[in-house]
Amino acid sequence: MEIISSCNTASITPYVPNTSNPWDVMKVKHLYKRLAYGATTTVLDAALSQTPQEVVDALLLDAQTTPNTPAPAWAYWDLSDFNDYDTENNEFISEWYRQAAKDIRDKNLKGRLTFFWLNHFVTQIETYFYAPYTFQYWDILQTHCLGNFKTFVREIGLNPAMLLFLNGFENSSQNPNE
């Protein structure tokens, strides 16, 4: 009796279209639904004129070369930089949420991966409620969404939003908050 140790029985062999498994509009749509948020007819038609590997390579290159969202003027402000902290901070957080939603939607694979890591390295805005930390956290997610995981974990662990979320301010060398 054969014992299967994994529920994933697929191989990691690259997909090569053939007559029984063609590179068609359904496969292209599926790819763009997984690695982006769908595609226009023009994009689908262009993808059909390329090999699957060329399309995937182009999507990865796009994610690697798409710049991070530029820092807003308030991205590294201290409390003393605010004129009216309550009003401005609320406005900046709302502004940033709109920008983050736009990034997720418009930056294809980079947007999807940033959103994925947002749900993996979770913080809670109510814990720190500070617009500059919100941007800085997002910037780390965008910077490292396709990069070295060890570097990513180190950077996200030192981010002010994450440190506050994890009560890092309660740590000391004699009494770590674990």
Model-found features: residue ranges?
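N-terminal module-boundary/linker segments of secreted carbohydrate-active enzymes
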Residues: M1-E95, K102-D103, N108
